[in-house]
Amino acid sequence: MAWDLKVKMLGGNDFLVSVTNSMTVSELKKQIAQKIGVPAFQQRLAHQTAVLQDGLTLSSLGLGPSSTVMLVVQNCSEPLSILVRNERGHSNIYEVFLTQTVDTLKKKVSQREQVHEDQFWLSFEGRPMEDKELLGEYGLKPQCTVIKHLRLRGGGGDQCA
């Protein structure tokens, strides 16, 4: 059953988001991101005195049609130093902002390591990183390590014939 959840911001503004009992906090953050343009990773939601954890359902948190959640937007204006480990096991430090895309980081890596962007891909904690996603969506922390993987190059077609 769908119902409207009231989301209140620190400045006093509020808005409604259509939700269901089985929806998770992560899904709610994605809907809020679509509605107000603040990326999910920058959102902190609270109900009464508890910070809402991403994997939990709204019903398990006791939220219902008359509930209001508080939205706090985390500032991401400070750069973050991360490591990118290449295929030889060497790591380089990169200054990034969580609001930048993976593609932006790939451009930096490409320039420093002299490897074309289409010849490698990046992963963090075993998860492939998509070019158009924001770095903040991956939960990067200061001094964390992103892995650079070389793409396999194709052969010449009918050489075995």
Curated annotation (Swiss-Prot):
Record SUPFAM superfamilies: Ubiquitin-like
Cross-link type Glycyl lysine isopeptide (Gly-Lys) (interchain with K-? in acceptor proteins), residue numbers: 155
PROSITE patterns xrefs: UBIQUITIN_2 (PS50053)
Superkingdom to which the source organism belongs: Eukaryota
Annotated spans, Involved in the ligation of specific target proteins: 151-155
GO molecular function terms noted in the UniProt entry: integrin binding; protein tag activity
Modifications the protein undergoes after translation, according to the UniProt entry: S-nitrosylation decreases its dimerization, thereby increasing the availability as well as the solubility of monomeric ISG15 for its conjugation to cellular proteins.
Boundaries of every Ubiquitin-like domain copy: 2-76, 77-155
Conditions for induction: By type I interferons.
Modified residues (S-nitrosocysteine): 76, 144
GO BP annotations, alphabetical order: defense response to bacterium; defense response to virus; integrin-mediated signaling pathway; ISG15-protein conjugation; modification-dependent protein catabolic process; negative regulation of protein ubiquitination; negative regulation of type I interferon-mediated signaling pathway; negative regulation of viral genome replication
Sites annotated Interacts with activating enzyme: 151
UniProt cross-references to PANTHER family, sorted A to Z: FI07626P-RELATED, UBIQUILIN
Comment text on domains: Both the Ubiquitin-like 1 and Ubiquitin-like 2 domains are required for its efficient conjugation to cellular proteins. The two domains play different roles in the ISGylation pathway: Ubiquitin-like 2 domain is necessary for the first two steps allowing the linking of ISG15 to the E1 and E2 enzymes while Ubiquitin-like 1 domain is essential for the final, E3-mediated transfer of ISG15, from the E2 to the Lys of the target protein.
Function: Ubiquitin-like protein which plays a key role in the innate immune response to viral infection either via its conjugation to a target protein (ISGylation) or via its action as a free or unconjugated protein. ISGylation involves a cascade of enzymatic reactions involving E1, E2, and E3 enzymes which catalyze the conjugation of ISG15 to a lysine residue in the target protein. Its target proteins include SERPINA3G/SPI2A, JAK1, MAPK3/ERK1, PLCG1, TRIM25, STAT5A, MAPK1/ERK2 and globin.
This protein's name: Ubiquitin-like protein ISG15
